[in-house]
Amino acid sequence: MSKEGYSLWLVGGTALLVADTAQPLRQYALDSILFAQLRSDKLNGSRFTRYGRWYSGYRTALEERGWVIVRSRSDHQQSQVGQSLVPVQRLSDDLQARHPSLSGHLRAAITQLSQGAMQQHLQPFTLAEQDKTTHCAYELGVMLPDASLEMCGLAFKSALPASQIRPDTHLQPLPAEGIDLRASAGTLSEYLTVAHRQGLHDLLERTQHVGKIIDLGVLKPEGDDATA
C-alpha cells in the first residue's frame, strides 16, 4: 500500500491522480496536460477522428512544454471472442502493473469516475457520436511523488449511444475494430523556470480554459489497501 496521499483531478479528457508531495509542480502538470490536448486539437483535429495522430501531437505538445518523455508505447488489441472491456479498469490495470502500491487509490478513482455527476464534464472530451457510432477516448494518469508522470490512454468505437457509455461500462464483446492503446511517461526538464510555468497558467486563464481543470478532492484508498 502507498503511504502517500493522492488527490484526483479532471483535466479535459484526462483523469489524473496527483501525489501530495508533488504539490509544488501540480499546477504546471495540470496546465501543461490541458494545453497539450488543446494544442493537438488545433493542429491535428479531433482525437475521435484519428486518435494515433492526435496522441502523437499531444505528446509532442507536452515535450514542447518542458516534459522529457522517457518512455512511450503504442499497441492495438484485436477483438477476440469472449473478451470484454471496461475502459477505466483497463487503464487502471496498466498503471497498477507498474505501480502496485497505487491499487487502493486507483480503485477509489474508478469509483469517483463512475459517478453520474462526472459524466457532464467527461463526455465532451471522451465521447463523440458520428454516423450511429460512438467514438471513445479515455486517459488515466498519475503524478508520482517525484513529480514524474505516467499516462495510459485508449480509444475505441462502439455501437452503443454515448448516453449508455461511461468509463466503467462493461463492453462485451470487445469493439469490432479493437482498441488503440497508448502510454507515456515523462519528467520535467530541470531548465523549466517559474516564469515559464506562470506564463502557461496565465495563458489558460486569458483564454478561459482553466474551468476544464476540476479538483475532485482527496482519494481514500479502497479495498485491502484501505486497512493495510
State where each predicted segment sits.
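Membrane-active amphipathic alpha-helices enriched in small hydrophobic residues
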Residues: 92, 98, 102-118
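C-terminal assembly and membrane-engagement modules of membrane-active proteins
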Residues: 1-88, 116-228
